[in-house]
């Protein structure tokens, strides 16, 4: 997704849909828009990331693109501290030690946009993982045998 080109030239945002390896423009997006941002978050809490196109022009609508693709396993991680975990690093490992993903928790997403302070991981077929969290203060914690398809809050219950 390219959220914007230029407000002055009437550029249309580029949104392509992957259909079996061929990318296509979805229906209804042939008119010029100027999306100043396109934050990504799991809006409907189904484990798949959705995109929200923020329209610049007040007379034109912003648009939520719900991800309705077949989903695999997933994990979301948040950290409770005075700044909502922003700056904490999260790594997720398979049981064999393979790194599945690494994220830094942040709350910014482009111009004039924000997102939840959550690290999101798509895990495919993996159903149990280990999570390593390193806080801004430098504290590192490892949590083994984490079940997936959940929002893990650390410390527990944050």
Model-derived segments and their meaning:
Residues 1-2:
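Electropositive polyanion-binding surfaces
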Residues 6, 12, 23-158:
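Gly/Ser/Thr/Pro-enriched helix-cap/hinge segments flanking short amphipathic alpha-helices
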Residues 16-17:
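Beta-propeller blade signature
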């Amino acid at each position: 997704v390219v959220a914007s080109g230029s407000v002055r030239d009437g550029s249309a945002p580029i949104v392509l849909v992957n259909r079996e390896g061929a990318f296509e423009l979805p229906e209804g997006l042939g008119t010029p828009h100027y999306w100043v941002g396109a934050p990504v978050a799991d809006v409907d809490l189904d484990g798949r990331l959705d995109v929200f196109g923020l329209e610049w022009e007040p007379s034109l609508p912003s648009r939520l693109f719900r991800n309705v693709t077949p989903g695999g396993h997933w994990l979301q991680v948040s950290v409770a501290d005075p700044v909502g975990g922003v700056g904490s690093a999260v790594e997720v490992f398979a049981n064999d030690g393979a790194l599945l993903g690494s994220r830094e928790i942040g709350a910014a997403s482009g111009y004039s946009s924000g997102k939840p302070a959550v690290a999101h991981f798509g895990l495919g077929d993996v159903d149990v993982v280990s999570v390593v969290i390193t806080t801004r203060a430098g504290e590192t914690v490892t949590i083994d045998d984490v079940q997936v398809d959940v929002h893990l809050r650390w410390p527990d219950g944050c």
